[in-house]
Amino acid sequence: MAPVADTTPEVAHSARVVVITRDGCHLCNEALTIVETVCGQSGTEWLAVDVDADETLRSTYTDHVPVTFVDGREFSVWVLDADRLRAALT
């Protein structure tokens, strides 16, 4: 059996928490507020990335934003739970 290709975007490894987002997306704004609060409380590095700034991200995630990655792995799509994120960072 051939190995499965890693489809995780390179940007997901840019910080401990990465949120792929888009301007004008209300769910993105909610996710960013949660990430800013939870990461601020724990001192965790995080990064927001605009899905429309990169063709590869746009083609993969355009219908799924916000997408949150923790430690380089997809953690949530659309709705981010603050308690679940907090637990993942401890």
Regions found by a protein language model. Name each.
Residues 65-74:
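A short, hydrophobic beta-strand/beta-hairpin element that forms part of a small beta-sheet core
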Residues 85-90:
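Thiol-/selenol-based redox modules, centered on thioredoxin-like
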